[in-house]
């Protein structure tokens, strides 16, 4: 792969929110995970761990999460995702992203059932046949999350290179106790996020959605 092809791969990756039921082979998943494991980490600690679910276990996890969501259970993740209160410019971008996605899916702002169904898709993993759970030791610090983020980005890029789509999901981590109970993970594991993986559905309009990215001038400060 030449430099232009690699840069094109970086630009090509975006969240997929509709998948076919075509299976993903274990060999392909192992290749992607092996590439992800090349991520750097502080003092080579490699703190990340991944639980891969397919088949009946994937379905059991989805069913358990959907049951919590349908019951109106309040999400309670193991860690706070973002700075609070969030800077207004962050909120502006989040709102713009949400509005654009709902417009594409033809979901009106006051259509509560449609919004509820939209949220539920997170827990059906958008139909993906594979769902991975990324976890860290309880009490993990910011640097450990930095390492896990680099691992996750490597993984998503590897999946893209292998012709697969993915969608990272903090929403799933909101029901961390359910995940631990269903997958037999101990209480001393923090759930970082889920990752839905599969072959993107080429007929799904939602998969054309790519949110705007900031221009360099908005996030780079050159100093000489």
Where is each model-derived feature located?
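Acidic, surface-exposed loops and disordered segments
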Residues: 1-224
């Amino acid at each position: 792969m030449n430099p232009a092809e690699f840069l094109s791969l970086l630009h090509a990756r975006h969240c997929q929110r509709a998948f076919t039921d075509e299976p993903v082979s274990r060999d392909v998943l192992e290749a992607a995970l092996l590439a992800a494991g090349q991520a750097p980490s502080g003092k080579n600690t490699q703190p990340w761990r991944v639980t891969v679910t397919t088949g009946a276990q994937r379905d059991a996890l989805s069913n358990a999460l959907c049951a919590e969501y349908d019951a109106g259970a309040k999400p309670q993740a193991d860690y706070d995702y973002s700075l609070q209160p969030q800077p207004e410019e962050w909120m502006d971008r989040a709102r713009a992203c949400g509005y654009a996605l709902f417009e594409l899916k033809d979901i009106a702002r006051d259509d509560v059932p449609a919004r509820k169904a939209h949220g539920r898709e997170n827990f059906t993993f958008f139909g993906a046949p594979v769902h991975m759970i990324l976890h860290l030791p309880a009490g993990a610090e910011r640097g450990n999350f930095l390492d896990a983020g680099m691992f996750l980005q490597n993984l998503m890029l590897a999946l893209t290179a292998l012709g697969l789509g993915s969608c990272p999901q903090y929403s799933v981590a909101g029901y961390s106790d359910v995940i631990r109970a269903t997958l037999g993970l101990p209480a001393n594991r923090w759930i970082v996020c889920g990752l839905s993986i599969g072959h993107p559905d080429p007929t799904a309009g939602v998969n054309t959605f790519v949110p705007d990215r900031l221009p360099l001038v908005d996030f780079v400060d050159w100093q000489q």
